[in-house]
Amino acid sequence: MPLIEQYDVVVVGAGHAGCEAAMAAARMGLRTALFTLNLDLIAQMSCNPAVGGIAKGHLVREVDALGGIMGELADAVGIQFRLLNTSRGPAVWSPRAQCDKQQYRVKMREVLESQPNLYIKQAEAVDVVVEDARVTGIRLRDGRTIRAGATVITTGTFLNGLIHCGEERIPAGRSGEPPSVLLGESLKQLGLRGCRLKTGTPPRLDGRTIDWARFEEQPGDADPTPFSFRTKTLPMRQISCHIAYTTPETLRLIRENVHRSPMYSGQIEAIGPRYCPSIEDKVVKFPDKDRHQFFLEPEGLNTHEVYVNGMSTSLPMEVQYEIVRSIPGLENAEMLRPGYAIEYDAIDPTELDRSLRVKKFEGLYLAGQINGTSGYEEAACQGIMAGINAALSVRDDAPFTLNRTEAYTGILIDDLISKGTNEPYRMFTSRAEFRLHLRIDNADRRLTPYGRRLGLIHDEAWADYEAKQARAVTLEKLLATRKIKDVTPLAPALAQAGITDAASLAGQTYAQLLKRPEMSIEALWTVIRAEVAEGEAASLFAPWFTNAEEASQPLPAFVRNELKSVETEIKYAGYLDQQRKSMEKLKKAETRVIPEWFDYASVSGLSREMQEKLVRVRPQTIGQASRIPGVTPAALSLINVYIEIQGKRLAKGGHPVQV
């Protein structure tokens, strides 16, 4: 008799999506099992040992604000922190951290193993169990059946994975690990539409064989910005990365051997990530460029392994050696691991609804690269959403979704389920219609109340959140109401900002002064400090002065971040109000639900092509339908009218379609 185990939620795959999914479900009180092919490689950073980056840092902040774990882990093992895009406006500032690859994996396992309700298992899932259009669990290669109220699949690049290095082809989920073939076939048998995608990774070098003096040093920020709102200190020693460039000899070697690249020989037919091209792709597509930049990034404090960011390649190993050694400073470099490309199966994300549930089956959720995305951060935000909704479904509660006005996470999911993707999807700030509202500094204000309601934010974190919001409200009110009586104390700040009309400031509020583009809130710190340190709200602001008794001491990072958030709300108030009006219009479209029974074929005036697209995606709202490529405003108006027509027929006891 086969062995059967029972859980509330089962998660397949312990990468960045799977870990977030399992933690979310367990923290919500559900008995959760997390299955992985190798317990020692949980949360493995298969590619770049870094978290965050432009737009990706926004996703990490959102995961953290909801109660996820990626941000805190990156802070705990980060060895270089940089805040990117600071030359532009605060809407697009984004944190990035180089991480200790080994410590990230170790720390993640510690966190998972210490979580009540969570059981981590090493085994291979080979089949999805389906009963009456409901997924009821999985089967393992060892014969066990794992029954669960909800199943989350987060297999990354493992579904029918195939590695390419030159002419060599190796079935693998990633280097050194077997692919998941049987589970891939099981998902195909469910009738889900799929595609074949490709990604790649660069060679790793031995840092002891690099002449570091030949490269430009790239240090981290002197005062690092953490990912997590809950992080108090950054414990790891900080180190530098280095900037390098290809040479004419590098380009010659690539051009002469490009026919041996699987991408150009026809060996790989899958589509790779547009915004993370291989080095051979760069050389072919940008023939006029005489050099390409790349970065030498240490993989940790206790290893000599160096990641060559910007040199992803699947050229033969001997060619990779020549390419590396064509660069001054790398003439004697030893390659620890070659770069490679990997093809894998993905599911068409238009098969999913907004909760990341597969529409055709109850109880089945997908997250991460299986949905056509690229990147740890894109995976993590899907993982926490899938885990939350898997838990809610077991409780028979309504799903939790985020829309495009609330979070980059909502934008990512909406893009996937509305438009699908034929290449690995990467998040950018340009994908957001309202990015001034979706900043890194206000991710907690946007999402932490949701996390608290769901049971993902513990009491101490919630108390810190409430205190922070109270400080922001108090400070905004103070700056908006307190008028400048004497400009003398402001003289240094005004001089630094280049403001010469000091006399005209008398009678203005500090908020009016702060609206000037050249004025920063930190320049007003002396005035603010005097107001909040001894005023009625002194106890509320006490955390600001714990480590800064003297006014001359540098501001702690969290104080600076809170001040900057208040400054942004004041300085961009007019633009924020304009965006709120546009957001309300979008929200109205999102509340207009398209019923599941709606028949597009009966809508007179819809072209066959448009009908096919709408039937394929099955949008849940008019707003989602509007974002399907090719669906026109006229078509949306028709759908709106026919929802009423078909609804009235149904209400009279008939069929929604006139027959």
Swiss-Prot record:
Main subcellular localisation? cytoplasm
Cofactor(s) this protein requires? FAD
Q: Which residues bind FAD?
A: G13, A14, G15, H16, A17, G18
The entry assigns this protein to a family as follows: Belongs to the MnmG family.
Q: Is Flavoprotein among this UniProt entry's keywords?
A: yes
Q: Where in the cell is it found?
A: Cytoplasm
Originating species: Acidobacterium capsulatum (strain ATCC 51196 / DSM 11244 / BCRC 80197 / JCM 7670 / NBRC 15755 / NCIMB 13165 / 161)
Q: One Pfam family, short name please?
A: GIDA_C_1st
Any Gene Ontology biological process: tRNA wobble uridine modification
Q: What protein name applies here?
A: tRNA uridine 5-carboxymethylaminomethyl modification enzyme MnmG
Could you tell me which SUPFAM superfamilies the record lists for this protein? FAD/NAD(P)-binding domain
Q: Name one GO molecular function term.
A: flavin adenine dinucleotide binding
Provide the alphabetized UniProt keywords. Cytoplasm, FAD, Flavoprotein, NAD, tRNA processing
- One cellular component GO annotation, for this chain's record? cytosol
Residues that coordinate or bind NAD(+): 272-286
